[in-house]
C-alpha cells in the first residue's frame, strides 16, 4: 500500500526558494536523500515513486498554482487508491514561528489556499506538516510576504534536513516523536543579512 507525501508550492523558477514553496523544498529533499527517480509529470503534478525503508512512497508536487492543488492530489490519491490516513501534506504556515514544525490531522486550513483546495476535493481527514515561515514583522502584505524569499536559507535547510532525517517516524504514524525530534533542532530567526 502506498503512502503519499505531497508538498505545496507554486510552479516556476520565480517561486523557487520562496516561503510559499517550503512544501516543494521538503519533497525535493526527500527525493534526493532517498534516491527516488526524477520527477515525471502526471495529472498536473510532478510525481516520483520509490521506497523509504520498507514503505512504498509517492512524492507529489502539484504543478498548478497553490489555489488549485486539490485536483492533482485528488487524481493521484484516486489513481493509486491511497487511504487519506496515508497522505501527508507539507505546507508553509505563517501562524507558527519560523522553522518550527507542527503535525496535525484534520482541522482548519488557517486561510491556506492550497489546503482549502485539497479540503474541497478530499475532505480534511489527512495529515499535515505545517512548516513555520513566521509572520511579517512590518506592514508587508501577507501575499507579498509568502511569495518573498527566505533570508535565513541555512536555517530552512537545517530544518528540512531534520524533517527528512526523521521522515520514517511520520510513515510509522509516530507523529509525536517526529515532532519532538525535529523540535530539538536549534531555534532560528529569518532576519535579513
Swiss-Prot record:
Keywords: Cytoplasm, Hydrolase, RNA-binding, tRNA-binding. The keyword Methyltransferase does not apply. It is found in: Cytoplasm. TRNA binds at residues 15, 65, 67, 113. This is Peptidyl-tRNA hydrolase. The record marks 92 as: Stabilizes the basic form of H active site to accept a proton. Monomer. Its EC number is 3.1.1.29. The gene is pth. Transmembrane segments: none annotated. The active site is at residue 20. It is an enzyme of class 3 (hydrolase). One of its GO terms (biological process) is rescue of stalled ribosome. It comes from the Bacteria. The lineage of its organism: Bacteria, Pseudomonadati, Pseudomonadota, Alphaproteobacteria, Rickettsiales. InterPro entries: Pept_tRNA_hydro, Pept_tRNA_hydro_CS, Pept_tRNA_hydro_sf. One of its GO terms (cellular component) is cytoplasm. The record marks 10 as: Discriminates between blocked and unblocked aminoacyl-tRNA. SUPFAM superfamilies: Peptidyl-tRNA hydrolase-like (SSF53178). Belongs to the PTH family. Hydrolyzes ribosome-free peptidyl-tRNAs (with 1 or more amino acids incorporated), which drop off the ribosome during protein synthesis, or as a result of ribosome stalling. Catalyzes the release of premature peptidyl moieties from peptidyl-tRNA molecules trapped in stalled 50S ribosomal subunits, and thus maintains levels of free tRNAs and 50S ribosomes. It holds the Pfam family Pept_tRNA_hydro. It catalyses: an N-acyl-L-alpha-aminoacyl-tRNA + H2O = an N-acyl-L-amino acid + a tRNA + H(+). GO terms for molecular function: peptidyl-tRNA hydrolase activity; tRNA binding.
